[in-house]
Regions:
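Glycine-aromatic micro-motifs
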Residues: 1-126
Length: 126
Protein backbone atom coordinates (compact mmCIF):
# COMPACT_ATOMS: atom_id res chain seq x y z
CA UNK A 1 0.00 0.00 0.00
CA UNK A 2 1.06 3.60 -0.54
CA UNK A 3 0.99 6.51 1.91
CA UNK A 4 1.37 10.22 1.14
CA UNK A 5 3.45 11.96 3.81
CA UNK A 6 3.64 15.73 4.06
CA UNK A 7 5.14 16.52 7.47
CA UNK A 8 7.68 15.25 9.97
CA UNK A 9 7.69 11.75 8.42
CA UNK A 10 9.34 13.18 5.29
CA UNK A 11 13.01 12.65 4.55
CA UNK A 12 15.31 14.96 6.56
CA UNK A 13 12.77 15.40 9.39
CA UNK A 14 12.92 13.91 12.90
CA UNK A 15 10.23 11.26 12.49
CA UNK A 16 11.51 9.98 9.14
CA UNK A 17 13.39 7.29 11.06
CA UNK A 18 10.08 5.41 11.31
CA UNK A 19 9.73 5.14 7.54
CA UNK A 20 13.43 4.50 7.07
CA UNK A 21 13.30 1.55 9.47
CA UNK A 22 10.00 -0.05 8.48
CA UNK A 23 9.08 0.93 4.90
CA UNK A 24 9.35 -1.66 2.15
CA UNK A 25 11.88 0.41 0.21
CA UNK A 26 14.44 3.05 1.11
CA UNK A 27 13.23 5.31 -1.69
CA UNK A 28 10.20 7.49 -2.24
CA UNK A 29 8.56 9.44 -5.04
CA UNK A 30 7.71 13.12 -4.96
CA UNK A 31 4.05 13.63 -5.83
CA UNK A 32 1.35 16.27 -5.70
CA UNK A 33 -2.29 15.98 -4.69
CA UNK A 34 -4.86 16.03 -7.50
CA UNK A 35 -7.35 17.91 -5.32
CA UNK A 36 -6.61 21.03 -3.31
CA UNK A 37 -6.43 20.95 0.48
CA UNK A 38 -5.63 23.32 3.32
CA UNK A 39 -2.32 22.50 5.03
CA UNK A 40 -1.31 24.62 8.00
CA UNK A 41 1.38 24.59 10.66
CA UNK A 42 0.16 23.95 14.19
CA UNK A 43 1.48 25.94 17.13
CA UNK A 44 3.37 22.74 18.04
CA UNK A 45 5.39 23.09 14.82
CA UNK A 46 4.03 20.19 12.79
CA UNK A 47 1.66 20.42 9.82
CA UNK A 48 -1.90 19.22 9.51
CA UNK A 49 -4.22 18.89 6.53
CA UNK A 50 -7.97 19.46 6.57
CA UNK A 51 -10.17 17.17 4.51
CA UNK A 52 -12.92 19.77 4.28
CA UNK A 53 -11.98 23.42 3.67
CA UNK A 54 -12.54 25.99 6.40
CA UNK A 55 -13.28 29.65 5.69
CA UNK A 56 -10.97 30.50 8.61
CA UNK A 57 -7.94 29.90 6.37
CA UNK A 58 -6.62 30.93 2.96
CA UNK A 59 -7.50 29.08 -0.24
CA UNK A 60 -6.70 25.35 -0.52
CA UNK A 61 -3.65 24.33 -2.58
CA UNK A 62 -2.31 21.28 -4.40
CA UNK A 63 0.02 19.76 -1.79
CA UNK A 64 3.51 18.41 -2.40
CA UNK A 65 4.76 15.42 -0.46
CA UNK A 66 6.43 12.04 -0.55
CA UNK A 67 4.92 8.70 -1.49
CA UNK A 68 6.12 5.65 0.45
CA UNK A 69 5.29 1.97 -0.02
CA UNK A 70 4.43 0.36 3.30
CA UNK A 71 2.96 -2.88 4.64
CA UNK A 72 0.10 -3.72 7.04
CA UNK A 73 2.39 -3.60 10.07
CA UNK A 74 3.61 -0.09 9.28
CA UNK A 75 0.14 1.30 8.53
CA UNK A 76 -1.01 0.10 11.97
CA UNK A 77 2.13 1.61 13.51
CA UNK A 78 1.47 4.92 11.73
CA UNK A 79 -2.16 4.88 12.91
CA UNK A 80 -0.88 4.68 16.49
CA UNK A 81 1.87 7.24 15.86
CA UNK A 82 -0.64 9.70 14.34
CA UNK A 83 -2.99 9.08 17.29
CA UNK A 84 -5.86 7.86 15.10
CA UNK A 85 -8.71 8.73 15.55
CA UNK A 86 -8.09 11.40 18.19
CA UNK A 87 -5.56 13.64 16.41
CA UNK A 88 -5.69 12.38 12.81
CA UNK A 89 -7.73 10.00 10.67
CA UNK A 90 -6.62 7.99 7.67
CA UNK A 91 -8.37 8.32 4.33
CA UNK A 92 -7.55 8.06 0.64
CA UNK A 93 -6.79 10.74 -1.95
CA UNK A 94 -5.47 10.85 -5.49
CA UNK A 95 -1.93 11.98 -6.18
CA UNK A 96 -0.27 12.65 -9.51
CA UNK A 97 3.25 11.67 -10.49
CA UNK A 98 5.53 13.79 -12.66
CA UNK A 99 4.60 11.54 -15.61
CA UNK A 100 0.91 12.48 -15.05
CA UNK A 101 -0.15 9.02 -13.78
CA UNK A 102 -2.72 9.28 -10.98
CA UNK A 103 -2.76 6.88 -8.02
CA UNK A 104 -5.10 6.39 -5.03
CA UNK A 105 -3.10 6.52 -1.77
CA UNK A 106 -3.51 6.92 1.98
CA UNK A 107 -3.17 10.26 3.77
CA UNK A 108 -3.62 11.38 7.37
CA UNK A 109 -6.08 14.26 7.81
CA UNK A 110 -6.47 16.25 11.02
CA UNK A 111 -9.45 15.09 13.08
CA UNK A 112 -10.12 18.70 14.05
CA UNK A 113 -8.68 22.13 13.42
CA UNK A 114 -5.56 22.70 15.51
CA UNK A 115 -4.26 26.00 16.85
CA UNK A 116 -2.17 27.93 14.32
CA UNK A 117 -0.15 31.15 14.36
CA UNK A 118 -1.75 32.41 11.15
CA UNK A 119 -4.38 31.50 8.58
CA UNK A 120 -2.08 31.10 5.54
CA UNK A 121 -2.10 27.67 3.93
CA UNK A 122 1.14 26.14 2.67
CA UNK A 123 1.80 23.93 -0.36
CA UNK A 124 4.74 22.07 1.15
CA UNK A 125 6.23 21.60 4.62
CA UNK A 126 9.93 22.48 4.38
Amino acid sequence: MLVFVYGTLKKNFDNHKILKKYSLHDTFLEVETVDKFQMLISTWGFPFVLKEPSNKFSEPLHLKGELWEIDDYLIEYLDAFEDVPKLYFRDTINVVFKNKIIKDVYIYFASEIMNTYDNKCIKEFL
